[in-house]
Every structure is written in C-alpha cells, then in structure tokens.
Amino acid sequence: VGVTWVQPRQNSVEALCYGINHFDGVEFDLRLTTDGELVLHHDNTTKDDNYVELLSSNEMKPFADKFDDLLARKDFTNPWQEQGKTVCIELKSPHPSSGIGGGWRGGSKRVEYISSMVKMVDDAISQFELPEGTTVLYSFDKKFLPAVKAAGWQHPKARLMPTLREWGSGNLQRAIAAPSFIAHSLPRLMRKHQKWGAPMIPCTLDYLHGMNRHLTLGTSVSLTGKGLEKLTKARKGFPAFVWPVRVPHEKLILDAGLTALTDDSSPKITHLPGGSPRITRPASEPLFDGQHIPWHEMTNDSRKELLSAQRKRWQWGRSVDELLDSTNENQIPWEVPRIIGHRGAGKTNFK
C-alpha cells in the first residue's frame, strides 16, 4: 500500500467504517451521556479521569464520537444492510462510583438504566432494513438479560461471561473474573448461553489456547488434536466469538470453525507468519471454486454448496435446509467463521 496507514482511535466512526469494510464485521462499545446521547467509548473514564456517564455529549466530543454519527455513514450502514456483515454492540454499564444507574446498589435502577440504553439502540437502528442475524447486542452486566426483556429487544442478544466488573484495574478485573472462568468450562458455558437464547458465545482465547485451558472444571478443549475434536463435537456449530486473536493464531481459530476478534487491522498485513495469504473476510468474501467471491454476489446454489461443505467439515447441528432458511444475499448464518474488527480497527492505547 503506497499510502501510510495510521490506525484510527478505537471505537471512532473512522475505525468502524474501516473495520466493517476490511473485515466480516465489527464490535464496538456504547455508553450514555448525561443528555441522553449514545457515544462510542470503551473505558468508564475519559483520559481526564472523568466518568463518561457524568459528562454531556458536548463534553465527550474530544474523546468519543456519537452513535448517530456512525449511523449517518453510508460506508458503514450499506455493508451492514447489504453485504451480510456482522455488528456486535456492547453496552457498557456506568462505574458504580459515578452514582449513575443505582451506583453501588444497582438493583432495579440498574435494570432501568440498561433498558433505556437498549431502547435507544433499538430506535436508532429501526430506520434500517437490517437482515435477521446481522446484529447482536451484549453486555457483561448481570442485569443485562432482564433489561433486554423489559425493553422488548427483538434482535439476538448475549450476556458476556466471565463477568469483568466495570471497576478496578485490568488485573483486578481479571482476578475477580477468575472464579467464574474456572467454574465454567467452554461446553458448559455454551449450554448456558443457548439457554439464554444467545446466537453465539463470546469467549476468551484462554479457553482454547495455552495452559489456562486446563484450569476450568469440566471438559477441557483446545484448537488442535483431540481437544479440537471434543470442541467441534460439543459445539455442533454453536458459534464461539474468540478474543483477543493475534495474526499468528488466526488460521488456527478459523480452521477450528470459530470466529476471531482481531486488533490487527493494518492493510499492510497481507500474509500470515507461515507465508500464506491473510484472509480478512472469510465469511463475507469466502473462497469458493478457487476465488474469493463476495457473499452477496454468490448464486443461491453456490451458497448452498459452500454451506454444505462447511456443515460437514465442522459437524454443524442444523440441516442444510435450516441453514438456507437463515440465509440470503444479505445474511450469513451464525455458524460461518468470521473475522471481526475489535473496536473497529483494533484496540488503541489512546482513549
């Protein structure tokens, strides 16, 4: 690439427009300002150490773009509507010390707060003709599922586990999550998510790679050999969205039939460490008959052939006919492995 690529700020409109076109979709975070605007921001404070939920959208301007500004961009909404791209929206809860949403006590005020966010997202995206299965809403908050129910959300939703609470340093958050990480082996976690009606399970790479996978109680799974066989058999095609996946692990994740959330978005990364070409849109521009064809340009017969082969390879539970029922030129079944841009074009250290 002749032009120098500069990674845009995480969760910015520019990052998300880049990510949805460069990958099979994007994941991003939403918070709510004092004047009732949804803004694209991950951390619970700004770099000035102010809680996001105690600031107005105007005060947040230097730190975060508005969700409405993202939805005004055709280079974001067109791929979402017309090319089978996946959009994962994470709702962020206020830090308890902010006093917002019930503060440390939470309770029904927390449910009301999250429910109002869900309704706002619903209202904002209702103007678009979004195919079923292109959007999933999720949160780490324990009150998320009752809040979604109260809001009457009709799209897919998932509660993130293990619970990383919205307070404390990264290390403290991980330590708090450890007991629930150990108690929930991946197959058990999958069953829980299926019971909750989630279309997929978001999970950490620790479950699949490295020594941590032996810490969980229950079936230990992995990305190769017997562990992978166990995982494939247990999943029956139930999708796992894995993070964080760096380029060296990308092929392993996709070959296992899983979806990768990536921070590596530079167009200069054209090859994997082993020398094979990097494929950034395995779902929305799959390899078929020796060439990469955009999903929305494939014939129905081609899509059927591709899905039949993938179903056989990864032992998906749904029949070909069931898969085709949730398929059209703008919609890719959840089972199909994807690469998703984390916070758009990847995590950045500047907020």
PLM features per residue range, with description:
Residues V1-K351:
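Phosphate-group recognition and catalysis centered on beta-loop-alpha active-site segments
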